[in-house]
């Protein structure tokens, strides 16, 4: 297959279709619905071990701490849920998104910090697992089962998509985690 980076005119939808075709060619027996499991879809044993662990997830205490942060009132009485549609339910799958006003790709974590800032609170460090890590882990559970709904709409968003695509394939030129997907043989 042709290089996706070299195919600069491919739309995000064309890239998505090319990726699906590549994986269906490499793993024809695996249903598309299993792709959500990532590498676990390639090993029944690994998937069974994961499912067993998830019966009593070792991170449940962290989720609980995140919930406490999510529900704790700010000094002004509001909570994180006031910053997100439907209190944060079914929103995480809409990230990241492109904001044309700032010309930035906005992550869920960036909007969590915007919520803190807008409510007069100190923002969390992105690498602080005790705050940002736990609140993000909890907040994402509010979107469990939600399909990913990332959109690339408009010239600015498309430019950011192309930048991300170039970065991804440059970093994965010789890698791809053993999938063989890299600049030299990615879909396109």
Language-model segment annotations:
Residues 40-52, 63, 69, 73-117, ...:
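Gly/Gly-Pro-rich "capping" loops immediately C-terminal to redox-active cysteine motifs
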Residues 1-3, 188:
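Intrinsic structural disorder
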Residues 3-61, 99-174:
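Post-cleavage N-terminal segment of exported redox proteins
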């Amino acid at each position: 297959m042709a290089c996706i980076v070299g195919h600069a005119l491919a739309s995000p939808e064309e890239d998505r279709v090319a990726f699906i075709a590549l994986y269906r060619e490499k793993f024809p027996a695996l249903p598309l619905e299993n792709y959500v499991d990532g590498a676990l879809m390639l090993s029944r044993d690994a998937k069974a071990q994961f499912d067993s662990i998830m019966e009593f997830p070792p991170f449940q205490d962290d989720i609980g701490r995140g919930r406490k942060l999510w529900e704790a009132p700010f000094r002004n009485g509001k909570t994180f849920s006031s910053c997100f549609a439907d209190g944060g339910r079914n929103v995480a799958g809409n990230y990241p998104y492109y904001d044309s006003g700032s010309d930035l790709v906005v992550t869920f974590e960036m909007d969590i910090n915007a919520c803190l800032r807008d409510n007069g609170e100190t923002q969390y460090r992105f690498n602080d697992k005790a705050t940002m890590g736990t609140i993000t882990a909890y907040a994402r559970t509010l979107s469990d089962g939600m399909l990913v709904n990332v959109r690339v709409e408009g010239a600015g968003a498309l430019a950011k998509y192309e930048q991300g695509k170039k970065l991804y394939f440059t970093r994965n030129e010789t890698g791809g985690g053993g999938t063989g997907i890299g600049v030299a043989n990615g879909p396109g």
